[in-house]
């Protein structure tokens, strides 16, 4: 029986590969079902012989208790967006300045959810969401319910791959029809449906909803040399790979490809929102490297957003956590990109003045980045003596006079005691990407603030069960859960705390970069601006903002209060040694290395505190030159930059 189970498993997996990956069914549905039922019967009789890659393991359901956090071995970066031909040409110019012979691979940008799949010896071990790029959620059991994801690769490789999980338009339509019949809320669009499906705790629901995938990247080291070779290998391994892509060195040809795809966008079985252009050479990708947020070797062209007309009924002004006052238009409802839109951002006062936006105007509304509704323009032909927009002079929350700094486009409330500013700061501190205090959302924060229980983030750690029980709608069980979540947040790594403080220009990724060097929040109280500016990926604006914040006496008091409350101040990741031999130096690798491969050399340089970049400029401090070094070496010589060889690096 063991042998027959193995035969059936291999045979059915091959048929699945032919059907889902090659789009070339090699067996009839009835024959497949007959073999499948035979395998099910045998596995039920001999459960000890069920194989890890059995197709039966992708059906049925398990109720999951929740999703564990998963730290990605290889971080997932966002892509720089482009919305015009000019931006693509600028990208091309930057790349060709370093690599005149570079070619590009243009691929479809699937409108789905990023996933990471890790295999050991050919077997699927972990499927995870993108999360913040460093930490996602382990959704392996749900991933296994997606039919075109192989449980076992065609080769026994240990590999991590990346791609998009999506829901086809046909599946989306069927699901919404069923939800409508059952009186359930319909999904807004296929992407939302796919996102909700991947986070289902009932795996049977995941299997029933028929998600699909396209894989496009090997995140782990690969023997391939080109991105198009990676796609071919992924297909050979059993993954679904999108068939639409273009290899070229010409931005004109890429633009033609974009326009061709845009024209046939509605004919595809799935949603796309653009085209991703990547440098095809993996070696060139490595040399070009990354910014803090995105690779320098890729760019995502986003299709123009859908636009609709709507009337502005009124405008609300709200205060954010940094004091910025943002105008939001209340609109006559319109259907836009699959959702009903009745509110749209007006950005800031300068934007309102520039566009001459008025109450009662008919305006063009679109979704910026296909996400945030925004007002694009006024339809002047439909204007009929509308009232001029009244720009507030006083804060809508605290009544303080608003300021409009010369170098800013927004109005700002600078009253540190402004109720809205404090509430937004508390909400941000408790948010998922910051201290992740589950349950402490805007509604409860508002109740706590109005009750006088919290005035700054340190007060959160002084809350008692009695405080929560005094709030309307909070029962004992909810209070216990909130207190447990607050207590759990104390052990977060310090970059979560730094981000949670809401310092201007200090995002989650920047917080991690800072703490990798300083290691402890307390060290930032005396950090020097010039030292911070030298950290890879930062600069003078971020450094100035950080030092100005921690120079305030209130910052030292707040840090002390948080420390006294037991909040962790230490960074739990790997710390960069500021005393390292090359700390703060910008280094470029060029030419062929004989003893170290490029990854090893880069890792060593970064371990020594260096920032490794792909291009030589006046900011470069050192060039490590291997054999056959070309234009970068010549440029370094012309700029008088220090040059060393591989042997020098190995001896450090």
Swiss-Prot record:
InterPro entries: BRCT_dom, BRCT_dom_sf, DisA/LigA_HHH, DNA_ligase, DNA_ligase_AS, DNA_ligase_CS, DNAligase_adenylation, DNAligase_N. One of its GO terms (biological process) is DNA replication. NAD(+) binds at residues 29-33, 78-79, 107, 130, 164, 278, 302. Its cofactor is Mg(2+); Mn(2+). Residues 577-652 form the BRCT domain. The active site is at 109 (n6-amp-lysine intermediate). Gene3D superfamilies: 5' to 3' exonuclease, C-terminal subdomain, 6.20.10.30, BRCT domain, DNA ligase/mRNA capping enzyme, Helix hairpin bin, Nucleic acid-binding proteins. Signal peptide: none annotated. It catalyses: NAD(+) + (deoxyribonucleotide)n-3'-hydroxyl + 5'-phospho-(deoxyribonucleotide)m = (deoxyribonucleotide)n+m + AMP + beta-nicotinamide D-nucleotide. Zn(2+) binds at residues 395, 398, 413, 418. SUPFAM superfamilies: BRCT domain, DNA ligase/mRNA capping enzyme, catalytic domain, Nucleic acid-binding proteins, RuvA domain 2-like. Keywords: DNA damage, DNA repair, DNA replication, Ligase, Magnesium, Manganese, Metal-binding, NAD, Zinc. This is DNA ligase. One of its GO terms (cellular component) is cytosol.
């Amino acid at each position: 029986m063991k042998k027959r189970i193995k035969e059936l498993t291999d045979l059915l997996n091959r048929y699945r590969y032919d059907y889902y990956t090659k789009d070339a069914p090699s067996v009839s549905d009835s024959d497949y079902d007959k073999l499948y039922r035979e395998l099910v019967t045998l596995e039920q009789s001999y459960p000890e012989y069920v194989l890890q890659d059995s197709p039966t393991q992708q059906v049925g359901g398990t109720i999951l208790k929740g999703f564990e956090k998963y730290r990605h071995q290889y971080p997932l970066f966002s892509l720089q967006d482009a919305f015009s031909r000019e931006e693509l040409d600028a990208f091309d110019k930057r790349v060709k300045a370093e690599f005149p012979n570079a070619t590009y691979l243009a691929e479809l940008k699937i409108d789905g959810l990023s996933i990471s799949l890790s295999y050991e010896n050919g077997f699927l071990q972990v499927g995870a969401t993108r999360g913040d790029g460093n930490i996602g959620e382990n959704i392996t059991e749900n991933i296994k319910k997606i039919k075109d994801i192989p449980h076992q690769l065609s080769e026994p490789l240990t590999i991590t791959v990346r791609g998009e999980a999506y829901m086809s338009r046909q599946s989306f339509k069927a699901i919404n029809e069923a939800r409508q019949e059952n009186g359930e809320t319909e999904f807004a669009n296929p992407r939302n449906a796919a996102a909700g499906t991947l986070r289902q705790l009932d795996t049977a629901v995941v299997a029933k909803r028929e998600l699909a995938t396209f894989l496009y990247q090997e995140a782990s080291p690969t023997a391939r040399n080109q991105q198009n070779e990676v796609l071919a290998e992924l297909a050979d391994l059993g993954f679904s790979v999108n068939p639409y892509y273009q290899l070229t060195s010409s931005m004109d040809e890429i633009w033609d490809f974009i326009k061709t795809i845009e024209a046939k966008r509605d004919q595809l079985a799935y949603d796309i929102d653009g085209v991703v252009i990547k440098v095809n050479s993996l070696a060139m990708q490595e040399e070009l490297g990354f910014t803090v947020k995105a690779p320098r070797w890729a760019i995502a062209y986003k299709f123009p957003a859908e636009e609709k007309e709507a009337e502005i009924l009124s405008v609300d002004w709200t205060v954010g956590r940094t004091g910025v006052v943002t105008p939001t238009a209340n609109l006559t409802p319109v259907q836009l990109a699959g959702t009903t839109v009745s509110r749209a951002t007006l950005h800031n006062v300068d934007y309102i003045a520039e566009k001459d936006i008025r109450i009662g105007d008919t305006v063009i509304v679109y979704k910026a980045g296909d996400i945030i509704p925004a007002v694009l323009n006024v339809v002047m032909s439909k204007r009929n003596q509308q009232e001029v927009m009244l720009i507030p002079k006083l804060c809508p929350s605290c009544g303080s006079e608003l300021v409009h700094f010369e170098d800013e486009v927004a109005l700002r409330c600078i009253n540190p005691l402004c109720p809205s500013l404090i509430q937004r700061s508390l909400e941000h501190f408790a948010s998922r990407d910051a201290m992740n205090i589950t349950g402490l959302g805007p509604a409860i924060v508002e109740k706590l603030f109005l009750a006088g229980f919290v005035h700054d983030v340190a007060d959160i750690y002084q809350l008692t069960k009695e405080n929560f029980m005094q709030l309307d709608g909070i029962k004992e069980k909810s209070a216990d859960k909130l207190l447990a979540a607050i207590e759990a947040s104390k052990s977060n790594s310090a970059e979560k705390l730094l981000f949670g403080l809401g310092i201007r220009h200090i995002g989650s990724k920047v917080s991690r970069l800072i703490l990798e060097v300083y290691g402890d929040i307390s060290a930032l109280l005396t950090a020097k601006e010039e030292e911070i500016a030298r950290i890879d990926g930062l600069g003078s604006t971020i450094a100035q903002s950080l030092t100005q914040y921690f120079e305030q006496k209130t910052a030292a008091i707040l840090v002390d209060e948080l420390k006294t409350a037991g909040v962790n101040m230490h960074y739990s990741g790997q710390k960069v040694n500021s005393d390292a031999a090359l700390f703060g130096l910008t280094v470029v690798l060029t030419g062929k290395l004989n003893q170290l491969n490029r990854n090893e050399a880069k890792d060593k340089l970064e371990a020594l505190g260096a920032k490794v970049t792909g291009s030589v400029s006046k900011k470069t401090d050192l060039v490590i030159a291997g054999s056959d070094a070309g234009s970068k070496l010549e440029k370094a010589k012309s700029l008088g930059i220090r040059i060393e060889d591989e042997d020098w690096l190995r001896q450090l």
